[in-house]
């Protein structure tokens, strides 16, 4: 009993300290900032030299050259620096996965092939160590996508759940959330005669006939779910609430079949992309293509159907052995030339911090710099329907901003100031802590 009382007393003291610390940190933040002297890249208009951005209550209150600085503003002198919108990673598992090899820290996918009722926001860990590492490179907001973990990005079943957009700062998801559901995630089935089994670390082969049967079965099941969702919506609209039995899975699919919620279809090979586009067309679904390693082969189709692409990491090998080695790096410029909207993404957790590197690599392979910047900011916001909140520096938008000492797509550039939802946010992180720790280690005597 004495031990229990002592434990409870210690717990209460610790919790009280935590609450005081949290309150102190919140209270210490002013609600008004003025960033002056920077070269402002709004991405909504021309570059503003020696401009001023005023932030009030989490949003951009004013931007321009002849802007009055409020008397209650905390002024940040950014002369000689660059000011950009915060970067946006639209397909990641940040907050859903901590250590890939420790299953207790992985909450990317659920058992079963059809889980439309799952929402990524409910599983995001706001205290993930990956969050400060990622935002230190200028990424201020992301979309957590369920069911896209692993080497083949097919770990979450056919319908993996709903993707959620949120900021990379905050105590809880209520603090961080931008939009709870931005897309329904569908891992498009593929006719695979050869696959890698991680349990035996070997390849498994099957006949084309068997692989085709599995593919047809998955597509038919997906079609059946959508048909049932339409019937469910009709029954709910016309039936008596007292007699109506609620089904969360079908209820979650209703916005999809009504065209209110897009489907993020993960597919890479040309055949799979074509099949997915045809299927979504027949079902009248609003499609976004995710990964799209061979999207360059079907640009005319994507443009005709007005389907945007969220590219996976471009520093990768092509899907086919006879494809030019640099095709993943040149694909962004080809999509641009074809008029297909696209954005970059990391498709991971620890590599979300490398998002600006992917865009920089695309610039080296022919993509114009301004288009690369749009592909890590406003493009994804437009694709997922949240461009009214993030993506550019405009009055009334959320103040997710980065102040850098150079081009954010250059590896050596550093983020000097980081604002998320109008709050000056620390760029300290575990990587930097370890760097400082070992940089200061005692030197051996010579």
Question: Can you annotate each of these PLM segments?
Answer:
Residues 26-27, 40-52, 64-65, 368-376, ...:
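Acidic, glycine-enriched loop/beta-strand segments at the rims
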Residues 130, 135-287, 414:
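Polyanionic/metal-chelating signatures
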Residues 99-100, 105-117, 262, 303, ...:
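His/Asp/Glu-enriched, well-ordered alpha-helical/loop segment
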Residues 50, 120, 145, 188, ...:
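Active-site core of metal-dependent hydrolases
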Residues 27, 31, 40, 44-84:
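Histidine-rich, glycine-flanked metal-binding segment
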Residues 8-19:
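Bacterial N-terminal signal peptides
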Residues 38, 53, 58, 80, ...:
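Divalent metal-coordination and catalytic microenvironments
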């Amino acid at each position: 009993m004495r031990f229990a009382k002592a434990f409870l007393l210690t717990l209460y003291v610790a919790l009280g300290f935590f609450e005081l610390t949290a309150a102190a940190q919140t209270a210490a933040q002013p609600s008004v900032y003025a960033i002056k002297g920077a070269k402002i890249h709004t991405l909504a208009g021309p570059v503003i030299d020696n401009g001023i951005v005023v932030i009030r209550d989490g949003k951009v209150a004013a931007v321009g050259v002849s802007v009055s600085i409020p008397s209650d503003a905390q002024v940040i002198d950014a002369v000689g620096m660059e000011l950009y919108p915060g970067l946006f990673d639209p397909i990641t598992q940040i907050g859903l996965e901590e250590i890939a090899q420790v299953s207790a820290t992985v909450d990317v996918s659920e058992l079963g092939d059809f889980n439309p009722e799952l929402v990524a926001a409910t599983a995001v860990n706001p205290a993930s160590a990956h969050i400060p590492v990622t935002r230190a490179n200028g990424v201020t907001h992301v979309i957590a996508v369920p069911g896209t973990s692993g080497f083949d990005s097919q770990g979450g079943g056919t319908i993996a759940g709903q993707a959620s957009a949120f900021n990379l700062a905050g105590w809880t998801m209520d603090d961080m959330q931008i939009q709870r559901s931005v897309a329904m995630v569908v891992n498009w089935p593929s006719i695979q005669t050869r696959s890698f089994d991680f349990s035996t670390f070997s390849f498994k082969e099957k006949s084309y006939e068997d692989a085709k049967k599995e593919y047809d079965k998955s597509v038919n099941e997906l079609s059946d779910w959508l048909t049932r969702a339409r019937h469910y919506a009709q029954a709910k609209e016309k039936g008596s609430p007292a007699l109506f039995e609620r089904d969360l899975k079908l209820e979650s699919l209703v916005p999809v079949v009504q065209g209110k919620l897009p489907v993020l279809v993960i597919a890479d090979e040309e055949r799979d992309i074509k099949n997915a586009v045809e299927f979504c067309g027949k079902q009248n679904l609003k499609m976004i293509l995710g990964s799209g390693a061979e999207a360059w082969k079907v640009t005319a189709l994507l443009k005709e159907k007005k389907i945007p692409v969220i590219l996976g990491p471009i520093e990768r090998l092509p899907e086919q052995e006879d494809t030019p080695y640099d095709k993943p790096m040149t694909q962004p410029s080809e999509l641009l030339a074809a008029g297909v909207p696209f954005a970059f993404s990391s498709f991971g957790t620890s590599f979300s911090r490398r998002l600006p590197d992917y865009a920089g690599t695309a610039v080296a392979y022919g993509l114009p710099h301004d288009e690369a910047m749009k592909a890590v900011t406003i493009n994804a916001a437009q694709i997922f329907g949240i461009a009214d909140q993030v993506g550019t520096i405009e009055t009334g938008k959320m103040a997710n901003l980065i102040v850098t000492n150079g081009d954010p797509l250059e590896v050596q550039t550093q983020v000097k100031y980081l604002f998320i939802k109008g709050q000056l946010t620390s760029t300290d992180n575990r990587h930097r802590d370890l760097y400082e720790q070992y940089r200061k280690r005692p030197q051996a005597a010579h």
